[in-house]
Amino acid sequence: MVKTQILGRQIIKVKHVSVKEFEANPSMIWDYDVMMHGTWDANADNVLNDNAVNEIAKYIDAGKGVLAGHDSVGFSMGTTLGLSKIADKFNIKRGLWNNAIQNGYDINNS
């Protein structure tokens, strides 16, 4: 039995790119509908540089998709590192971790 392919469906192509490679050429994301960043716990302390974050912000503004790992926005990144700089684009409220304010936002008092 041959499955009929419907254009734009059932096609998932994944290309693994290192953080260094992405930072050197962040415009590569425009070749894809969705980009993903941050699969390791605490993202293995890989923080994207400002050039990469700015390109991702434009990508989101253009309606493209970004899937971010749970520690790549917030946690120890605060509001000044990596994707946390554009956390508002993800509609994420960041809060407390082990009773220590990581980023100046107390979710319990919002």
Show the residue positions of the predicted features.
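Aromatic-Pro/Gly-enriched surface loop or interdomain linker
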Residues: M1-D41, M77, L96-N98
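A glycine-rich, often tryptophan-bearing local segment used as a flexible ligand/cofactor-contacting loop or short
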Residues: D41-S110
